Amino acid sequence: MKLFVLCIFAMMATLAMSRSWTYVQPKFLNKAFEVALKEEIIVRWDRKLAKWLRVNGGPLSHVQKKALYFVNRRYMQTHWANYMLWINKKTDALGRTPVVGDYRRLGAEIGRRIDMVFFYKFLSGRNMIPKYMPYMEQINRMRAADIPVKYMGK
């Protein structure tokens, strides 16, 4: 139930960001570009979570804190196609061939713009942090670059 509610909120945030249901036409994405995006997004969100945990994480158990790190990774996986929609617009607007630095900058902007602190407050305030499961541990142990997403490059 907790994970279901989390998914509903993730869907609402996606709709608020995209303002429409749009099919993202698959487009070749270089593996280096994908890695740069993932690393920057996760680094920004993990920083926000670490800062939030320092201030508000006292009542949370160690397992609940690990579950919140999983929330970061699952949120990125869930919304990857929408991020690519936005990234395609931004890279097309460059007027040149994008480089890894452009994707790092865009990943950092996604990580900065999306207010994950709202989700941490919501989940912890309503005691809705998902129960920590073995599959969560597997994803948490992965490097940001290795987290599987749909719409991957070749």
Swiss-Prot record:
Name recorded for this polypeptide: Egg-lysin
InterPro entries the UniProt entry points to: Egg_lysin, Egg_lysin_sf
Biological-process GO terms, alphabetical: single fertilization
Signal peptide location: 1-18
Assigned keywords, A-Z: Fertilization, Signal
Known function: Dissolves the egg vitelline layer nonenzymatically during fertilization. It creates a hole of about 3 mu-m in diameter through which the sperm pass.
Oligomer status and interactors: Homodimer.
